[in-house]
């Protein structure tokens, strides 16, 4: 019989820059429940980071070294019409942003706040980027199942219609990130 009051022991995790020269335990079996993210993490992440196609933050179990979560991002630009009504004042025709490409936490670690922890670390990285090269915010294409998660973090939908892959474009202005 299981004691309902038994404490669940959460792993002690380390959020760090993903290193393409390391083989992380669990990476080849990574399963966050999203087939696109799973396939990318298992087969393409290492090469994409090595080739500077993206940067990545990793969430690692300190004890086992297991890859718990991943967040990939890259420089990007949006046409100002895409963010009309979201940004104040006059804007150039193209605005610089950081694009959050993929965010995934292994299923067995989901619903424990690790995705939010990984995003908070990502936002700290975005602040550093902004100090070196000012940007207007963070852009992402949200899987429909993740829209509420991103909305709770302050992201707004840029379109009511999903793209051809079923994802909705969302945006978080840099002011919100800097204020956090």
Report residues per predicted region:
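Non-catalytic substrate-recognition and accessory regions of acyl/acetyltransferase enzymes
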Residues: 1-112, 117-139, 143, 147-180
């Amino acid at each position: 019989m299981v004691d309902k009051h038994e404490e669940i022991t959460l792993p002690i995790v380390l959020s760090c820059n993903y290193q393409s020269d390391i083989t992380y335990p669990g990476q080849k079996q990574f399963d966050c429940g999203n087939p696109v993210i799973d396939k990318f993490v298992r087969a393409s992440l290492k090469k994409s980071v090595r080739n500077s196609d993206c940067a990545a933050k990793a969430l690692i179990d300190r004890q086992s070294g297991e890859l718990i979560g991943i967040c990939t991002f890259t420089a990007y630009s949006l046409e100002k019409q895409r963010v009309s009504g979201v940004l104040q004042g006059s804007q150039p025709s193209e605005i610089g942003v950081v694009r959050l490409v993929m965010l995934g936490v292994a299923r067995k670690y989901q619903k424990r706040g690790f995705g939010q922890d990984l995003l908070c670390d990502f936002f700290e990285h975005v602040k550093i980027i902004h100090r070196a090269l000012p940007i207007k915010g963070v852009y992402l294409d949200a899987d429909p199942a993740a829209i509420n998660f991103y909305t709770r973090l302050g992201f707004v939908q840029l379109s009511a219609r999903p793209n051809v892959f079923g994802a909705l474009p969302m945006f978080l202005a840099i002011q919100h990130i800097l204020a956090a």
